[in-house]
């Protein structure tokens, strides 16, 4: 009974003070596995059922499923999801990622929670395009990711979630041997199969 009491006390202390029982690398691995799984299952299902019809729909679906899947991890480690994020490492960069999973200091005196962010654990850019010529807009977001790796001090993984409603083979948007993306970028891709035009959701890890 004493041991159980000690464990429960430590768990309460973790939630209150943000004392982590996992390393950042372990937390980011959990987040990474969840993001990849959600993309290939829940997001594909939502798209096929016509719940995702534009970029805002994609954003809200990702937010919902991440909250649902990772709720215990978020609570234990004081993690929150921010959209159109422009604080912490991004405050003076001129960039505003579509979505960020970040840790907050629960004891911060900041007026707003965005000011209480201590570090980012995942950064996501999103794109939903329907025309073949929209490829250039997708490539532009990859250039943003490249700028993040070159100009910002980020230790987390970067994700590019793209739904491109055109027929295509499962492929990557950036070269597989691109040095700037190696070990940093994960592509969450979706397109349509040739002929049948069925959705295909897949992941490429650089």
Located regions from the model:
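A domain-level signal for the structural core that forms small-molecule/cofactor-binding pockets
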Residues: 122, 142, 162
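Conserved catalytic cores of phosphodiester-cleaving nucleases, focusing on short active-site segments
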Residues: 99-101, 119-130, 145
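Active-site metal-binding core of divalent-cation-utilizing nuclease and nuclease-like domains
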Residues: 75-116
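Charged, often low-complexity linker/regulatory segments
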Residues: 2, 7, 15-68
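Domain-level recognition of nuclease-like catalytic cores that cleave nucleotide substrates
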Residues: 150-206
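Active-site-adjacent loop/helix micro-motif of nuclease/hydrolase catalytic cores
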Residues: 94, 108-111, 131-143
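Short acidic, S/G/P-rich loop/turn micro-motifs used as interaction or catalytic elements
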Residues: 129-134, 167-170
């Amino acid at each position: 009974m004493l041991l159980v009491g000690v464990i429960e006390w430590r768990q309460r202390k973790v939630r209150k003070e943000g004392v982590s029982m996992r390393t950042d690398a372990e937390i980011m691995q959990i987040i990474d596995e969840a993001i990849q799984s959600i993309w290939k299952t829940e997001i594909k299902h939502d798209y096929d059922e016509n719940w995702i019809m534009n970029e805002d729909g994609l954003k809200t679906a990702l937010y919902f499923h991440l909250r649902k899947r990772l709720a215990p991890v978020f609570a234990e480690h004081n993690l929150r999801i921010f959209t159109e994020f422009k604080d912490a490492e991004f405050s003076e960069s001129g960039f505003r990622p579509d979505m960020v999973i970040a840790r907050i200091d629960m004891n911060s005196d900041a007026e707003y929670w965005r000011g209480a962010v201590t570090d980012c654990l995942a950064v996501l850019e999103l794109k939903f395009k329907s025309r073949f010529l929209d490829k250039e807009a997708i490539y532009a977001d990859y250039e943003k990711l490249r700028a993040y790796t070159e100009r910002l001090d980020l230790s987390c993984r970067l994700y590019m979630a793209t739904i491109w409603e055109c027929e295509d083979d499962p492929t990557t948007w950036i070269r597989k041997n691109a040095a700037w993306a190696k070990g940093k970028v994960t592509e969450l891709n979706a397109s349509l199969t040739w002929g049948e035009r069925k959705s295909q959701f897949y992941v490429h890890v650089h």
